[in-house]
Every structure is written in structure tokens, then in C-alpha cells.
């Protein structure tokens, strides 16, 4: 049997830990780097990530570490699970070590200052690296508990996709491939905003019709925006689009859903985020997405409505009334409507 090449995972959160465990279960030696030396030591001793994945045993093949330079030297396949706000500051000082390596982003976020996706930041930091993204309906705890799960690895580099499939694909985790890196990654980032809306709707006792309407109109809205930026609309009918949107907008395990649910219960945004105790990328994404949609003149009423509630002092009832009074458009944007003429 061929010995597996070592792999690195950057980030000590729930998803980074779940992916590290998956790799180790497939016989891959893994170093999982995190900034907090106390967290690394506790995970190494107790074989658990109590803050982010309490009750899930850390596989013996995962080595939690705090030495970033040694970790970057360790492997030429690196999964990057850093918060969007930290990715650039962590990796830019070590750009030279990333040359020629395979960097796969696991982070579903957008950089506020530039509106760049995480893989685009990786490209900027390390133009000679091979870049990919992993995205889909992937709740970290369910992955860690071996629930049947599928995901998408996306890259223009077919060999990179095949390599990621080889190390991650297993009995409970299926890995599909796509060449639409931008569309796959954008879908993962955009759906976080709509999960906040869905969580609010549930907390407020809205009906199943309402929740279904929100999810399908969210899909139309995020697809419309993505296509304006050059993505393939068909990507949004797959795991990284509608698949990720459904699970994130339906599950109390979703961090962004939890924030929305707390808001619907009457908490302030600050209180909701503090109660979560983790990063909810949707809050940051909402701000930059609202500005970008206005800049490129893409109609995104759900984004505008949530922004009005969280940052403009509008009430939910005011926003709902405005949304329901808006002129209804066609149901699906990307099919011929000539029959209506």
C-alpha cells in the first residue's frame, strides 16, 4: 500500500477540525495549525476540540500544532480554514513558502475591503500556488459524526481536484468536482446572508410557505448576482448552490441561522453574535454584498431588507410590507419568457 503524503489544515475551528478528522480517518497524516498555543496543547492532550466540536474525538492521526512555519513546510497540500478577516494577515507574511503548493480554501466569506473571495486572496498572496475551494451543504458537526455528506471541490486545475477527492472521499463523505471555482465559492459565501433571514423567520413563527418562499427567492437572488459577476448559473443548481442554501437555511446547527434565530427572539446583533461564540460570516458578508449589489445595480431585495433591519433601524414589519408590495417579477431569470409576450 502506498504511504499517504502528509496534509496540513490551517484553522482550529469546527470545520477545520472536521476536515482534519476526515483526512486522518482515510489514513492521511495531518497537522492542524491554530494560533492559540493553549488550544493546540489542550487538543493534543485531551484529543478533543471542546470549544468548537465538543464530544467529538480527535483522530490519533491529527497533530494539533502552533508552529505555522513548520506546518507550511510540512505539506504541499494545505486546507485553509481561517476566518475571512484573518486569512490575509496570517498567510501574507509567509507567501514565499506557498509557492507551488496546493491551497484549498474551506472558508465561506468575502473580504470586506476588496470584495475578494478567499481563493482570490490566496491567488494574490501566492500567485504561483495551485488554488481550489471546497464548498457544499457541509455542517461540521454532522461531518464529524459521520452523517452521509457530499461536497464540491472546485478548481481550474483538474489534478488538484483529483488529489482532493483522493484524500477526502470516503464511506460517508462524497467529493464531486467542478471547474467553476468562482461560482462554487460565491455560492458558499452568499448563502450565509439568507440563513440569517431564515433563522429570523423561524423564531418569529412564520409558516412553511413563507420559509419555502424565502429559500427559493434567495436562490434566485444570489444566482442573479453571481451571474452578473461571471459565474455559471448552473452551478447554483448543485451542491454548492441550492444544496448549501437548503441546509444552511433549515438547520439550527448553522451558525448564521443561529444568529438570525437569536435576532428573531429579540436579541441585538451584538448579543446574538456573542451568544454564538464563533464567527458568523453572514454578518460581514451582508455589509459588503449590499454595497456591491448597489454598485453593479443588481436587484437584491432580501439583502437590502436584512441590511435595513440590522443596520438602518427598520423594523421587520416595515421590511416585510415593502417586500410584499414590490412588483413581482418572473419566477426564474435564466429561461426564456417569450411565451408571455
UniProtKB/Swiss-Prot annotation:
<keyword id="KW-0963">Cytoplasm</keyword>
<feature type="binding site">
    <location>
        <position position="191"/>
    </location>
    <ligand>
        <name>sn-glycerol 3-phosphate</name>
    </ligand>
</feature>
<keyword id="KW-0521">NADP</keyword>
<feature type="binding site">
    <location>
        <position position="254"/>
    </location>
    <ligand>
        <name>sn-glycerol 3-phosphate</name>
    </ligand>
</feature>
<feature type="binding site">
    <location>
        <position position="279"/>
    </location>
    <ligand>
        <name>NADPH</name>
    </ligand>
</feature>
<keyword id="KW-0444">Lipid biosynthesis</keyword>
<protein>
    <recommendedName>
        <fullName>Glycerol-3-phosphate dehydrogenase [NAD(P)+]</fullName>
        <ecNumber>1.1.1.94</ecNumber>
    </recommendedName>
</protein>
<keyword id="KW-0547">Nucleotide-binding</keyword>
<feature type="binding site">
    <location>
        <position position="256"/>
    </location>
    <ligand>
        <name>sn-glycerol 3-phosphate</name>
    </ligand>
</feature>
<comment type="function">
    <text>Catalyzes the reduction of the glycolytic intermediate dihydroxyacetone phosphate (DHAP) to sn-glycerol 3-phosphate (G3P), the key precursor for phospholipid synthesis.</text>
</comment>
<feature type="binding site">
    <location>
        <position position="244"/>
    </location>
    <ligand>
        <name>sn-glycerol 3-phosphate</name>
    </ligand>
</feature>
<feature type="binding site">
    <location>
        <position position="140"/>
    </location>
    <ligand>
        <name>NADPH</name>
    </ligand>
</feature>
<comment type="pathway">
    <text>Membrane lipid metabolism; glycerophospholipid metabolism.</text>
</comment>
<keyword id="KW-0594">Phospholipid biosynthesis</keyword>
<keyword id="KW-0560">Oxidoreductase</keyword>
<feature type="binding site">
    <location>
        <position position="108"/>
    </location>
    <ligand>
        <name>sn-glycerol 3-phosphate</name>
    </ligand>
</feature>
<dbReference type="GO" id="GO:0046167">
    <property type="term" value="P:glycerol-3-phosphate biosynthetic process"/>
</dbReference>
<feature type="binding site">
    <location>
        <position position="108"/>
    </location>
    <ligand>
        <name>NADPH</name>
    </ligand>
</feature>
<keyword id="KW-0443">Lipid metabolism</keyword>
<dbReference type="InterPro" id="IPR006168">
    <property type="entry name" value="G3P_DH_NAD-dep"/>
</dbReference>
<dbReference type="InterPro" id="IPR006109">
    <property type="entry name" value="G3P_DH_NAD-dep_C"/>
</dbReference>
<dbReference type="InterPro" id="IPR036291">
    <property type="entry name" value="NAD(P)-bd_dom_sf"/>
</dbReference>
<dbReference type="InterPro" id="IPR008927">
    <property type="entry name" value="6-PGluconate_DH-like_C_sf"/>
</dbReference>
<dbReference type="Pfam" id="PF07479">
    <property type="entry name" value="NAD_Gly3P_dh_C"/>
</dbReference>
<feature type="binding site">
    <location>
        <position position="15"/>
    </location>
    <ligand>
        <name>NADPH</name>
    </ligand>
</feature>
<dbReference type="GO" id="GO:0005829">
    <property type="term" value="C:cytosol"/>
</dbReference>
<feature type="binding site">
    <location>
        <position position="14"/>
    </location>
    <ligand>
        <name>NADPH</name>
    </ligand>
</feature>
<feature type="active site" description="Proton acceptor">
    <location>
        <position position="191"/>
    </location>
</feature>
<dbReference type="Pfam" id="PF01210">
    <property type="entry name" value="NAD_Gly3P_dh_N"/>
</dbReference>
<dbReference type="GO" id="GO:0051287">
    <property type="term" value="F:NAD binding"/>
</dbReference>
<dbReference type="InterPro" id="IPR013328">
    <property type="entry name" value="6PGD_dom2"/>
</dbReference>
<dbReference type="GO" id="GO:0005975">
    <property type="term" value="P:carbohydrate metabolic process"/>
</dbReference>
<keyword id="KW-1208">Phospholipid metabolism</keyword>
<comment type="similarity">
    <text>Belongs to the NAD-dependent glycerol-3-phosphate dehydrogenase family.</text>
</comment>
<feature type="binding site">
    <location>
        <position position="255"/>
    </location>
    <ligand>
        <name>NADPH</name>
    </ligand>
</feature>
<feature type="binding site">
    <location>
        <position position="35"/>
    </location>
    <ligand>
        <name>NADPH</name>
    </ligand>
</feature>
<keyword id="KW-0520">NAD</keyword>
<dbReference type="GO" id="GO:0046168">
    <property type="term" value="P:glycerol-3-phosphate catabolic process"/>
</dbReference>
<dbReference type="InterPro" id="IPR011128">
    <property type="entry name" value="G3P_DH_NAD-dep_N"/>
</dbReference>
<dbReference type="GO" id="GO:0046474">
    <property type="term" value="P:glycerophospholipid biosynthetic process"/>
</dbReference>
<feature type="binding site">
    <location>
        <position position="136"/>
    </location>
    <ligand>
        <name>sn-glycerol 3-phosphate</name>
    </ligand>
</feature>
<dbReference type="GO" id="GO:0047952">
    <property type="term" value="F:glycerol-3-phosphate dehydrogenase [NAD(P)+] activity"/>
</dbReference>
Amino acid at each position: 500500500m502506498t504511504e499517504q503524503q502528509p496534509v496540513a489544515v490551517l484553522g482550529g475551528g469546527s470545520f477545520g477540525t472536521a476536515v482534519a478528522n476526515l483526512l486522518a480517518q482515510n489514513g492521511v497524516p495531518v497537522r492542524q495549525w491554530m494560533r492559540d498555543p493553549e488550544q493546540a496543547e489542550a487538543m493534543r492532550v485531551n484529543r478533543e476540540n471542546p470549544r468548537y466540536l465538543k464530544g467529538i474525538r480527535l483522530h490519533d492521526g491529527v497533530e494539533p500544532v502552533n508552529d505555522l512555519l513548520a506546518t507550511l513546510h510540512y505539506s504541499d497540500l494545505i486546507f485553509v480554514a481561517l476566518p475571512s478577516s484573518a486569512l490575509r494577515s496570517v498567510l501574507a507574511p509567509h507567501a514565499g513558502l506557498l509557492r507551488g503548493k496546493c491551497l484549498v480554501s474551506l472558508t465561506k466569506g468575502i473580504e470586506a475591503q476588496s470584495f475578494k473571495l478567499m481563493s482570490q486572496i490566496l491567488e494574490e498572496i501566492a500567485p504561483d500556488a495551485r488554488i481550489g475551494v471546497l464548498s457544499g451543504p457541509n455542517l461540521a458537526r454532522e461531518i464529524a459524526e459521520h452523517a452521509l455528506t457530499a461536497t464540491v471541490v472546485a478548481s481550474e486545475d483538474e489534478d488538484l481536484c483529483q488529489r482532493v477527492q483522493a484524500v477526502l472521499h470516503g464511506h460517508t463523505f462524497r467529493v464531486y468536482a467542478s471547474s467553476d471555482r468562482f461560482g462554487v465559492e460565491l455560492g458558499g459565501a452568499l448563502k450565509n446572508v439568507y440563513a440569517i433571514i431564515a433563522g429570523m423567520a423561524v423564531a418569529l413563527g412564520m409558516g412553511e410557505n413563507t420559509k419555502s418562499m424565502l429559500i427559493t427567492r434567495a436562490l434566485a437572488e444570489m444566482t442573479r448576482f453571481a451571474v452578473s459577476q461571471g459565474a455559471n448559473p448552473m452551478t447554483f443548481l448543485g451542491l454548492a448552490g441550492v444544496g448549501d442554501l437548503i441546509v444552511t437555511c433549515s438547520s439550527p446547527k448553522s451558525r448564521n441561522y443561529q444568529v438570525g434565530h437569536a435576532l428573531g427572539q429579540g436579541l441585538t446583533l451584538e448579543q446574538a453574535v456573542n451568544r454564538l461564540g464563533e464567527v458568523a460570516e453572514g454578518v460581514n458578508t451582508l455589509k459588503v454584498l449590499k454595497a456591491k449589489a448597489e454598485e453593479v445595480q443588481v436587484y437584491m431585495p432580501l439583502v437590502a431588507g436584512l441590511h435595513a433591519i440590522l443596520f438602518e433601524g427598520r423594523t421587520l414589519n416595515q421590511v416585510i410590507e415593502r417586500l410584499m408590495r414590490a412588483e413581482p417579477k418572473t419566477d426564474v431569470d435564466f429561461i426564456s419568457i417569450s411565451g408571455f409576450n
